[in-house]
From Swiss-Prot:
Coiled-coil features, chain-numbered ranges: none
Protein name per UniProt: 3-isopropylmalate dehydratase large subunit
GN (gene name): leuC
NCBIfam families: leuC (TIGR00170), PRK05478.1 (NF004016), PRK12466.1 (NF009116)
EC number: 4.2.1.33
Family: Belongs to the aconitase/IPM isomerase family. LeuC type 1 subfamily.
Molecular function in Gene Ontology: 3-isopropylmalate dehydratase activity; 4 iron, 4 sulfur cluster binding; metal ion binding
Source lineage: Bacteria, Bacillati, Bacillota, Bacilli, Bacillales
Binding site for [4Fe-4S] cluster: C337, C397, C400
Record's function text: Catalyzes the isomerization between 2-isopropylmalate and 3-isopropylmalate, via the formation of 2-isopropylmaleate.
Species in which this protein is naturally found: Bacillus cereus (strain ZK / E33L)
Domain of life the protein comes from: Bacteria
CDD domains: IPMI
Named cofactor requirement(s): [4Fe-4S] cluster
Keywords assigned: 4Fe-4S, Amino-acid biosynthesis, Branched-chain amino acid biosynthesis, Iron, Iron-sulfur, Leucine biosynthesis, Lyase, Metal-binding
Length: 464
């Protein structure tokens, strides 16, 4: 019987197996940020240990930093975490993309753009959305702070092998429908626990047509379906994306030959298989308080089925049967490790070019990295956004989570390109609606959601 991509990635990294069936995996890349690393470094210090492989470790600052005035950090805890990371990286000789550095940005944006993320690698980070890197054919997953310390000290991690889920995506997406809509559809249909105990492998003709940044969006949110990770077999697009980047292999041809062997064999069998035809897929909007609570833009909000729905409707200030077009939008956030790359900003800019943000709507564009920001500015995207009435910010996690100055006021609704819509995620009492960059940009123009499949966004307003 053939092997799945998961099998090939896993087997190449097993150092040993213990009596409980746990495998000790070697870790090829450890990404670090300021929030989940302080206790881990302190653990090394208390036990007089060193970082085993500083050359396989890379740190950045992203969660806590302000995106408006990056040097004016007024929150005491945030400043302490940033200062601590700076001190720890210096003491343990770990490379750091500090505030203002050309390599600084959201950890899951800079990994791929710097060429740190490569096919065949095992990649970990003390962050849920490490699965993003799986778009390159890497086995990437989030870990806890105690595990961060273990990897820093040993460059290994004890893990139990997950099962393999195959998700076949067929068909061609309509204009105005994106990878974000695919993953929101998947979650709305199968729920937030469908992937528990699995690694999701996305494949099929739809994947082949996607560019790398779209694939990253898919894998980024595999964790929202409960999966350990999301992976996609590398192909020519993957190889072309990695080639020539700062930390890409110098002996590139040798590596590309090895990478081309990373795929699921034709006779391999997945433990669970799902098939989705994306041909008739519509833009999605989440209405509730977890990512599976979403509907198509042309659907009404669902009926209440349990106490969770009851609580979600109450928190969000919405009602069953309500039109998605009637949901008010007071804030728009285009950013996060899900949708803050150059192609995401280009899509949003195309929607708002020559138009104006609706009066009363606050709209932010937060590039995922310094390099993304610079590239966008070279294309003049910042002018398009600013002329439309958006705020053009410095890179960081920003409004994705209520851990920095960028927050949504209590009781107000935000169209967000991020990945989580939990209660309080964007600030106390904030009401988050997950959408694609195009949907978020269009919502900024009208103060409510519209159908991005329409040639004229005005045509969507008459829906009832």
């Amino acid at each position: 019987m053939g092997k799945r991509l998961l099998d090939k990635l896993w087997e190449k990294h097993v150092v040993t197996t213990n009596e409980n069936g746990l495998d000790l995996l070697y870790i090829d890349l450890h990404l670090v940020h300021e929030v989940t690393s302080p206790q881990a470094f302190e653990g090394l210090r208390l036990t007089n240990r060193k970082v085993r492989r500083p050359d396989l470790t890379f740190a950045t600052m992203d969660h806590n930093i302000p995106t408006k005035d990056v040097w004016n950090i007024t929150d005491r805890i945030a400043k302490q975490q940033l200062d601590t990371l700076r001190e720890n990286c210096k003491q343990f000789q770990v490379p750091l993309a500090d505030i203002g550095d050309e390599e600084q940005g959201i950890v899951h944006v800079i990994g791929p753009e710097l060429g740190l993320t490569q096919p065949g690698k095992t990649i970990v980070c003390g962050d849920s959305h490490t699965a993003t890197h799986g778009a390159f054919g890497a086995l990437a997953f989030g870990i806890g702070t105690s595990e961060v310390e273990h990897v820093l000290a040993t460059q290994t991690l004890w893990q139990r092998k997950p099962k393999a889920m195959g998700i076949e995506l067929k068909g061609k997406l309509q204009k105005g429908v994106y990878a974000k809509d695919i993953i929101l559809h998947l979650l709305s249909k199968y729920g937030v626990a469908v992937g528990t105990g699995y690694v999701m492998e996305f494949y099929g003709e739809t994947i082949g047509a996607m560019e790398m940044e779209e694939r990253m969006t898919l894998c980024n949110m595999a964790i929202e379906g409960g999966a350990k990770a999301g992976i996609i077999a590398p192909d020519e697009k993957t190889f072309a994306y990695v080639k020539g980047r700062k930390y890409a292999p110098r002996d590139y041809e040798t590596f590309e030959k090895k990478w081309s062997e990373l795929y699921t064999d034709a006779d391999a069998i997945y433990d669970l298989h799902i098939s989705i035809d994306v041909t008739d897929l519509a833009p999605y909007v989440t209405w509730g308080t977890n990512p599976s609570m979403g509907v198509r833009i042309d659907e009404k909000l669902p009926e209440k089925h349990d106490v969770n729905d009851e609580r979600a409707f109450s928190y969000m200030g919405l009602s069953p049967g309500q039109s998605t077009y009637d949901i008010p939008v007071q804030h728009v956030f285009i950013g996060s490790c899900t949708n803050s790359r150059l192609s995401d900003l280009e899509i949003a800019a195309a929607v708002v070019k020559g138009r104006k943000v609706k009066e009363g709507v606050r709209a932010l564009v937060v590039p995922g990295s310094k390099r993304v920001r610079d590239a966008a500015m070279q294309k003049g995207l910042h002018h398009i956004f600013e002329e439309a009435g958006f705020e053009w910010r410095e890179p960081g996690c920003s409004m994705c989570l209520g851990m920095n100055p960028d927050q949504v006021p209590e009781g107000e609704h935000c169209a967000s390109t991020s990945n989580r819509n939990f209660e309080g995620r964007q600030g106390k009492g904030a009401r988050t609606h997950l959408v694609s960059p195009a949907m978020a940009a269009a919502a900024a123009l009208y103060g409510h959601f519209v159908d991005t499949r329409k040639e004229s966004y005005d045509g969507a307003i008459s829906y009832s």
